[in-house]
């Protein structure tokens, strides 16, 4: 038997060729000294020789079927007996294709075997894995998690009940019976079911009747939330709930501000604390704090400075044009006080600035700030008519509160009641 690709590189042997004894005797000879292959080397092998090229579904190459059967017996052992007519073929040798058809049948690599239950004492072997022995749809459902949230599972269980109410144990039973995936480990998903029942507003707890035996309350589905479960998917509507909560908060804050305003107008006490002042209650959360700054100027010792500032006089004069109750507030002017440009807002000559006069103009202050802060809030503080702080570490009462009221720049300053 000789080799095709040389003495050292041949892999497939060809039977019927002379042995390479002559070439092996002189390993150091150059390649030219070797005898070339003749035409007899490429001739067909004898019929009785074993052919290593085997086909499972047909005869061997270059030999009759009897030689192929002998070679197959040498490699695979004795062939199994032929199956009876109409029966399935063996796992390795498939029957030849019918005459007139093209293609060949391919044998399976492994036959599906039934799953053997693994004993709890010993772990499952390699042949007992579930993905190798998958034989039914139930086995597939045990491996794949259902594409439903826990809220959707609870809603399915409640809607499947005749009375549309179930206890917690019945919800567990429905989920485990409907979805085999949850039959494996019950600790994790049962905790999630309890959390969703407690935290989701769509599920309401109904106490059990006295004549109803058993224990545990019933759980029902809110009728308003039935449309939120579309094909098993729970659609949350958090935006509407947040908007409703914001609306109730704003309404509560408005009523509280009105009560504070009425109490502040009724009592004309100057030494009112800052937490209960009407200017603090009327201050909006999204706008600057002009009432807070006004209150701070009232409690600061720089009261006489208000009388010598023409900008403040012009500011109050612009507020007087927007005031509705100017005729009523005119009667509250005190004798011997200095006029600030707004009817009803009077400053005593002693220099003490009462918060009562500020509370009368606080409503107009808010209206003016809301109308002008959006359009003129981007202007630089360079054009502000109020001077900056020049004293030590203390800030001026006009440093920040009125910077957004830039419409004062375009007004003409009256000289009445002001000291220049």
UniProtKB/Swiss-Prot annotation:
Stretches of Polar residues bias are at 294-306
Q: Which gene encodes it?
A: FOXI3
Entry's disease: Craniofacial microsomia 2: A form of craniofacial microsomia, a disorder characterized by a spectrum of craniofacial malformations ranging from isolated microtia with or without aural atresia to underdevelopment of the mandible, maxilla, orbit, facial soft tissue, and/or facial nerve. Most CFM2 patients exhibit isolated unilateral or bilateral grade II/III microtia, with or without atresia, although some patients show only minor external ear defects. Mandibular hypoplasia, micrognathia, and dental anomalies have also been observed.
Annotated consequence of substituting residue 236 to W: In CFM2; decreased transcription factor activity; decreased localization to the nucleus
PTM per Swiss-Prot/TrEMBL: Phosphorylation promotes the transcription factor activity. Dephosphorylation by protein phosphatase 2A (PP2A) reduces its activity.
Q: Where is this motif: 9aaTAD?
A: 406-414
Biological process GO annotation list? anatomical structure morphogenesis; cell differentiation; epidermal cell fate specification; hair follicle development; odontogenesis of dentin-containing tooth; otic placode development; parathyroid gland development; pharyngeal system development
Q: Outcome of altering residue 236 to Q? A: In CFM2; decreased transcription factor activity; decreased localization to the nucleus
Function statement: Transcription factor required for pharyngeal arch development, which is involved in hair, ear, jaw and dental development. May act as a pioneer transcription factor during pharyngeal arch development. Required for epithelial cell differentiation within the epidermis. Acts at multiple stages of otic placode induction: necessary for preplacodal ectoderm to execute an inner ear program. Required for hair follicle stem cell specification. Acts downstream of TBX1 for the formation of the thymus and parathyroid glands from the third pharyngeal pouch.
Report motif location: Nuclear localization signal. 235-241
Q: Which domain of life is it from?
A: Eukaryota
Stated name of the protein: Forkhead box protein I3
| Calcium as UniProt keyword | no
């Amino acid at each position: 038997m000789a080799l095709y690709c040389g003495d050292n590189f041949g892999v497939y042997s060809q039977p019927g060729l002379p042995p390479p004894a002559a070439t092996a005797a002189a390993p150091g000879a150059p390649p030219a000294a070797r005898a070339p292959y003749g035409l007899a080397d490429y001739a067909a092998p004898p019929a009785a020789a074993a052919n290593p090229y085997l086909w499972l579904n047909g005869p061997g190459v270059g030999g009759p079927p009897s030689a192929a059967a002998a070679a197959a017996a040498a490699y695979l052992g004795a062939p199994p007996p032929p199956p009876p007519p109409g029966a399935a073929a063996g796992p390795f040798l498939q029957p030849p294709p019918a005459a007139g058809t093209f293609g060949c049948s391919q044998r399976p690599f492994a036959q599906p075997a039934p799953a053997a239950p693994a004993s709890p004492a010993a772990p499952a072997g390699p042949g007992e894995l579930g993905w190798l022995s998958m034989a039914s749809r139930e086995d597939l459902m045990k491996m794949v998690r259902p594409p439903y949230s826990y809220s959707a599972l609870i809603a399915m269980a409640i809607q499947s009940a005749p009375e549309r109410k179930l206890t917690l144990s019945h919800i567990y039973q429905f989920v485990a019976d409907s979805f085999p995936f949850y039959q494996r480990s019950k600790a994790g998903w049962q905790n999630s079911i309890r959390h969703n029942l407690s935290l989701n507003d769509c599920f309401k707890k109904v106490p059990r009747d006295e004549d109803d035996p058993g224990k545990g309350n019933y759980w029902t589905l809110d009728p308003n939330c039935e449309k939120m479960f579309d094909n098993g998917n729970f659609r949350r509507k958090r935006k509407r709930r947040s908007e409703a909560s914001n609306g109730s908060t704003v309404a509560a804050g408005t009523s509280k501000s009105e009560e504070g305003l009425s109490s502040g107008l009724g009592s004309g006490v100057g030494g009112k604390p800052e937490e209960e002042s009407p200017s603090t209650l009327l201050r909006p959360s999204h706008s600057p704090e002009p009432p807070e700054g006004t209150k701070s100027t009232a409690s600061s010792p720089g009261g006489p400075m208000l009388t010598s500032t023409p900008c403040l006089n012009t500011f109050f004069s612009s507020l007087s044009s927007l005031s509705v109750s100017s005729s009523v507030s005119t009667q509250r002017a005190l004798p011997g006080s200095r006029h600030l440009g707004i009817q009803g807002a009077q400053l005593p000559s002693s220099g003490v600035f009462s918060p009562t006069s500020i509370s009368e103009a606080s409503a107009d202050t808010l209206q003016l700030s809301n109308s002008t802060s959006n359009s003129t809030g981007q202007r630089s503080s360079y054009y502000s008519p109020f001077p900056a702080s020049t004293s030590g570490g203390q800030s001026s009462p006009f440093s920040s509160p009125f910077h957004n009221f830039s419409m004062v720049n375009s007004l003409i300053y009256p000289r009445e009641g002001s000291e220049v």
